[in-house]
Each structure stands twice: as structure tokens, then as C-alpha cells.
Amino acid sequence: MTRAPGVLIGVDVGCTTLSGGLVTPDGNVLSAMQAPTSLGAGTAVPTILGIVADLHAEAQARGLALEAVGIGVPGLVDAERGMLLHSAGSQVADLHRVPLAELVSAKTGVPAFVDNDVNALALGEWMFGLGRRAASCVVLAIGSALGAGIILDGRLVRGKSGFAGEFGHVPIDFGGPPCPCGGRGCLSLYVGGEYIAAEARQRISREPSSLLALAGGEAGAITAETVFAAAAAGDPLARSMVDRACRALGAGLAITVNGLNPEVVVVTGGVVKSLLPLQGEIIRRAGEYALADSLAGTPIHFVPGHKSQTVRGGAALVLYERARRGAGLPR
């Protein structure tokens, strides 16, 4: 009897959108679907299980054998137990301390793995994307905040407590504003979309700006994208914020290449679309802080985030964990 071709399910739990897809072991996304993450208290787990069940049914209808499920979630994850321990996003608070991998495995009858979403994203870029064939690869993901996924010498770096990659909470301004993490002047405060938008909404009440008009007169409608568009049109307030974001991200890249010396760096996420015209300025700023030889020898790619990329990350997590656990390697 011929065995059905194998397929994986990759899931990315974002703070606003949950994405899932069927992915072949070589990274080809066969189909994908999305659902809002913010559906109300108690809905995160049923929404995830529902998308997984729908994808499992689709795999069966296609004559494909589901092999495993990989899920990326935002926050601190216990990868061995397959659960989210803590996240700053209230949208996923329902997942805290929930044995998600166990629940998904019980639903599907196949192994399930859970890790930090940026770790999964980094594994996807390393296996299927711009980090292919590199022994070391760092992914900086810039969405509402900034996080990093680190592959060094072919191993995902999680750190002793799972906090490795929290580059968004590296202080770059010791006298800067307070961060929700308890620190001050953290990198995320200057480049994260949520923080850029919040600061702009706050400052328009006391500084002249076209931002309110661009947002249709609604301060709450101002987003990071609004700020970048206003800066491109010459708005002084927006330009000052975008210039600072370029300097801050340049410093973040310098920290990355000086501290880790990776073969390749990928900057991705929802904010990156707005950063594309500013790549040259960001790299120039990085050159002001980085060791020249380290920066010159490291390709830095800017890639806007997209659904297939995050879904592949979940599939890559499966492949990585199966290989790691099969070899008996520590996490």
C-alpha cells in the first residue's frame, strides 16, 4: 500500500492575526488561512484548535498525511512543555500556562511543538529563506515591538531561561522613556510600530503636524505607517521620529553584528515595508556604531513580513525539533 505524502501544519499566533497553513517538508506552502486573534476572553485556544482542525481536514481531503504541527506564539515559551509562560500582549493572555502542544496533539493525533514566534520565524528563514546554507543567521522581527531569533552554528539559541533574542529590550538611551518591561530607553520604544504610533498620538497635541489630517482627523487612527508616510511628505514631527528610528535600528544592527558576527541578518516584520526606502540610511547609521569589518562582511536583508513566511516558520520548528530531539541534543 502506497503511503500518503506527508505534510506539516504551521501556525503563527500574532497579537492581531492568527495564521495557519499546510506546508510540505521542503517549505512549499500549499494553502493558508487566517483568523483574528482578538476575539474575546477564552477564545484563543478554540481559535487555534479550530484552524488546526480545518487544515487537518484539508490535508485529508488532499490525500496528505499530517505528520506534525508547529506553532509560534509571542512571548516567553517553555519549548519542552509546549506552553506560553508569559506575553506582554493581552490578546494572548488566554494561552498563559496552557499546555498548547498537548492539546493540539490530542486534537490531531500527531506531535505538536510550540516556541516563540520569532524563533520559529528565524528557523523558517534559515531552512527555507535568505539564511539557507548559512551556519549562522539572525532574524530581527519588527512589528508592534522588536524581537530576534538567533541561529548560531546550526543551533537555535534559546538561552538558559528562554529569553535569548530579546534585543528589543536592550537599552540604547539610558535617559529614555520607561518601557513596559521595567527598563528605560529600550530599542523597541523607538522602532516598534505600537510605540511609534503611541508617541505620535501623544505629541500631536503639543506639536504642529499633518499626522492628524492624514489619519482622517482621528488620533486613534494614527499608525506607524502614517508616521512614515508623513515623514516622506516632509512633516517635521514625523521626520524627527523616523530619523530617530533609523538611528535606533542602526544601533540595533551594530549590536547584532558586533555581538554575534552572523553570516546573514534578515530584518522583517510588519514595519519593514515602511523601512524599505530607508535601508541605505539605516545601514549608514549602523556603520557609525558597528565594527567596520564585521558589518562589511555581513549581508543585511530587509524583507516585509508576509503570511507564507510565518506559516513556514511553524513548519520549520517541527523539522528542527524532530531533528534535535531525535539526536538527543539539549534545547
Model-derived features with residue positions:
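Short glycine-aspartate micro-motif
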Residues: 8-12, 66-70, 113, 137-141, ...
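Glycine-rich phosphate-binding loop of actin/hexokinase-like ATP-binding domains
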Residues: 134-190
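Glycine-rich beta-strand-to-loop/alpha-helix junction loops that act as flexible
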Residues: 69-75, 267-271
